[in-house]
From Swiss-Prot:
This is Tachykinins. Residues 24-94 are annotated as: Disordered. The gene is Tk. Keywords: Amidation, Behavior, Cleavage on pair of basic residues, Neuropeptide, Secreted, Signal. The modification Valine amide is found at residue 153. Strong expression is seen in a group of 14 cells plus one isolated cell in the midgut of stage 17 embryos. Also expressed in a pair of medially located unidentified cells, just posterior to the brain, and in two lateral groups of cells that may be associated with tracheae. Expression in the larval gut is restricted to cells with endocrine cell-like morphology in the posterior midgut, just anterior to the malphigian tubules. In the brain, expression is detected in a restricted number of neuronal cell bodies. Residues 60-69 have a biased composition (Basic and acidic residues). Residues 1-24 form the signal peptide. Residues 25-47, 285-289 form a propeptide. It comes from the Eukaryota.
């Protein structure tokens, strides 16, 4: 029994020795993948995660936390864009320093355009712009001088409105016959004196008597048909008052009905027209004797 028990103990010891490395490896893997923050002395190890500096593309962040190099993305070895011999303020040196790193800003479709800052280039562009402006002003001045002649005034537009209610333009100096013809033509084009001369113009009342309808046989009080000079061409409406007539007419007497039937009695004798309200548009003025 002793040899058998010794063999069993030896087998168990060998089994323990074989399983110990595998358990240690599993423990190390679990500890490395732990989400806990590592200690100050323990190095940081991240498994299957993106770099800690996040985006390292076009905007060129460093993928290592403590990297102090210039970040030459052209690779190791001699730099083909070595501008060490150039001056520090030259555009070549600036361009070389820029090519050694990713751009600091987005330079895509809507991005900024890199232009080397050069005072000489700015001076050249400004001088070219001033020269172009000077040539343009000189050419404009020469064109004005060469194109001026005696008929330049006649080509200008009239100084004022020359329509129906407008002013007659001043006649230019020239032939007397031509001036007379032009004045006659302009006079014929003007509106009549006693007619409507515009949208806001007034109409003369001196010629309104013949435009009224003749006196008919109705003899009513509606006041739309009047004699030529009756009521001074004023509107006589239904709402107008009718004053009493005194009996010194021509054989008519004081009959009020006769005054209504014969409205022309106002013109006979020494009778004046009534001063009362005779319509919707105001009073009727007294007729001159």
């Amino acid at each position: 029994m002793r040899p058998l028990s010794g063999l069993i103990a030896l087998a168990l010891l060998l089994l323990l020795l074989l399983t110990a490395p595998s358990s240690a490896a599993d423990t190390e893997t679990e500890s490395s993948g732990s989400p806990l923050t590592p200690g100050a002395e323990e190095p940081r190890r991240v498994v299957k995660r993106a770099p800690t500096s996040s985006f390292i593309g076009m905007r060129g962040k460093k993928d290592e936390e403590h990297d102090t190099s210039e970040g030459n993305w052209l690779g190791s070895g001699p730099d083909p864009l070595d501008y060490a011999d150039e001056e520090a303020d030259s555009s070549y040196a600036e361009n070389g320093r820029r090519l050694k790193k990713a751009p600091l800003a987005f330079v895509g479709l809507r991005g900024k355009k890199f232009i080397p800052i050069n005072n000489r280039l700015s001076d050249v562009l400004q001088s070219l712009e001033e020269e172009r402006l000077r040539d343009s002003l000189l050419q404009d001045f020469f064109d004005r001088v060469a194109g001026r002649d005696g008929s330049a005034v006649g080509k200008r537009a009239p100084t004022g409105f020359t329509g129906m209610r407008g002013k007659r333009p001043a006649l230019l100096a020239g032939d007397d016959d031509a001036e007379a013809d032009e004045a006659t033509e302009l006079q014929q084009k003007r509106a009549p004196v006693n007619s409507f001369v515009g949208m806001r113009g007034k109409k003369d009342v001196s010629h309104q008597h013949y435009k009224r309808a003749a006196l008919s046989d109705s003899y009513d009080l509606r006041g739309k048909q009047q004699r030529f000079a009756d009521f001074n061409s004023k509107f006589v409406a239904v709402r107008g008052k009718k004053s009493d007539l005194e009996g010194n007419g021509v054989g008519i007497g004081d009959d009020h009905e006769q005054a209504l039937v014969h409205p022309w009695l106002y013109l006979w004798g020494e009778k004046r027209a009534p001063n009362g309200f005779l319509g919707m548009r105001g009073k009727r003025p007294a007729l001159f004797e």
